[in-house]
Amino acid sequence: DLFNEESSRRLAHLVDYISSNGELSKHIIGYHLENNEWFQYLYRENGQDFSNANNEKFARWLKVKYPTDRDLQKAWGNPFVKLSTATVPNNLPGNIYDNSKLYKDILFYGTKAQKYVDYHQYICDLTAARISNLARIVKERTENRAIVISFYGYQFELYSSLSGHHNLNWLLSDKNIDGFAGPIGYRDRNGSSYAPNSPVGATGAYMSTVDSIQRNGKIWFQESDERTFINHTDEPYEDTFLTPI
């Protein structure tokens, strides 16, 4: 929440500064909201956030969904869990990315899996809420004159909702968001590391439900993040990660 408050303040300051500067503002038609594409940085490689801050935020989310301990206990099939002590599940299936188990545990069902469903939904709700908040700030500060788009909705390649990308309906109904963006699909693009045997050209597919996005009156912005002929490394873009701090 502190990060969200600070980023909101800084975004408002940036938009106000640009809007008040005639030389700058005449070149700006909109804002592309981006925060590591809105999923936790390296969440697949390093796993989810089990910090006290995230545990507390998850507990507050649970209290909205489940008014009483009894409601939570019934949903989770656990007579001992309480709203005051519930935490992020420490045995989240698929928490650490493993390509050999890519299609395992995509769907959850039953009371024993409800705690996982809830955490996945929490992450998606939190991500969508952050984007929605920043979009509102841009629209308010520009009096609805600026276009607002955001990276989001990578359902076709980020299969796990731990990415936070599986709440597109929320943002499709948000009047402050004009569109979404995403890179060309990584799994079938000119021999990427995910699909090294794919032919030159390949499909270059969309990562999201582009037709649904457009039917809801939103823009889809297709990003090409492929290496150009200027590249002098032997590593494809998707293998070139920054070292985590």
Describe the residue ranges of each PLM region:
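Acidic-and-aromatic substrate-binding clefts and catalytic sites of carbohydrate-active enzymes
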Residues: 154-165, 185-205, 229-232, 236-239
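Polysaccharide-binding and catalytic clefts of secreted carbohydrate-active enzymes
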Residues: 1-171, 177, 185-186, 203
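Active-site clefts of carbohydrate-active enzymes
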Residues: 99-118, 206-243
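Active-site-adjacent "gating/activation" loops or surface patches in catalytic cores
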Residues: 171-180, 213-217
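Short amphipathic alpha-helical segments and helix-helix/interface helices
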Residues: 135, 168-169, 207-211, 245
